[in-house]
Amino acid sequence: PIILIKESLLKNGINVIDFINNAKILNSKSEIRRAINEKGIKINDIIVSDHKKIINLGFLDNDCIKVSYGKKKHYKIKIN
């Protein structure tokens, strides 16, 4: 699925937990933290191991950011 988010969120940088929460990939911030601790979240095919990681416009690859949750759930986050 493709999810649209506002460019202003990434312009100044946003915490990875808030980024995933704004994209509505998981239901709660605690669920996101748990998935990060279990190494279940990838951004652009790189495992996220730090829940304080900042996501910004530098993560854009072909105008989108690929977020994976688990083995089979993959999302493209595009800038609106």
Question: What function would you assign to each model-found segment?
Answer:
Residues P1-N80:
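Conserved nucleotide- and phosphate/pyrophosphate-binding catalytic cores
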